Amino acid sequence: MSKKIVLALGGNALGDDLAGQMKAVKITSQAIVDLIAQGHEVIVTHGNGPQVGMINQAFEAAAKTEAHSPMLPMSVCVALSQGYIGYDLQNALREELLSRGINKPVATLVTQVEVDANDPAFLNPTKPIGSFFTEQEAEQLTKQGYTLKEDAGRGYRRVVASPKPVDIIEKETVKALVDAGQVVITVGGGGIPVIREGNHLRGASAVIDKDWASARLAEMIDADMLIILTAVEKVAINFGKENEQWLDRLSLSDAERFIEEGHFAKGSMLPKVEAAASFARSRAGREALITVLSKAKEGIEGKTGTVICQ
């Protein structure tokens, strides 16, 4: 049975530099086209953690050495990352589709996502961006005015505000493109964060979590399924411990209980489970799947992954 699927890719799965990204999108595109070949409508979203951090750092470094080089706000850095990633991803998807004899247009949409100016996240930056640093490197960057936090045992990363998405500004455009039979790449990096001021949309200094933005998009375009891709095949409780348990299905009540018990790492699995549960809760019959990219096709068939449902 054909489904309308929002597929959320992680920014870390797209490589750490230009060469790595070009290789990664080819592998990613093969898995995405596997789903399209099955008859599913696939809307692709993606993270931008490494990429937006590099863009921001590059312009900051240039501004320190070149008087005429501007400091770019985070909203503009997110917009740049949407074009940078979308360009490679849409071309890789187009090539993979044509190689299989599938004539389906691919479009990358510059997408704005509304956030609340009073969201408490602006007072407590938590969203990791950019490269990993050692503790010593983190101390030096802190002295330079950056905020860094330890990221799930992998090192230290810069963090910025991560408000919850309220509205997808270009949602009608996404719907129109999907209805016209196109593969749409949208809400890249969680979307460009904007605050509504009357008829004006003002860029916000933040990076929206792409899993939360993907869940909101999936709700607003009436998707059947949200697939959140990660580095592991299934969600686990007691991860890394002797009593580690991998989960095939996760009810909303169990998801809430495991979140309260602290089973999922902040900045890693926690936002994925929270976003998946939010989508599943939004309407009866909606399901979210968390799995690894190479198993997405099997996950839809119920053979692997963790399904979050009512």
UniProtKB/Swiss-Prot annotation:
Annotated SUPFAM superfamilies: Carbamate kinase-like
Highest rank taxon of the organism: Bacteria
Molecular function per GO: carbamate kinase activity
Transmembrane portions of the chain: none
Leader sequence residues: none
InterPro entries from the UniProt entry: AceGlu_kinase-like_sf, Asp/Glu/Uridylate_kinase, Carb_kinase
One GO cellular component term: cytosol
GO biological process entries: arginine deiminase pathway
Keyword terms, alphabetized: Kinase, Transferase
Similarity remark: Belongs to the carbamate kinase family.
Protein name in the entry: Carbamate kinase-like protein YqeA
Organism (species): Escherichia coli (strain K12)
Classification of source organism: Bacteria, Pseudomonadati, Pseudomonadota, Gammaproteobacteria, Enterobacterales
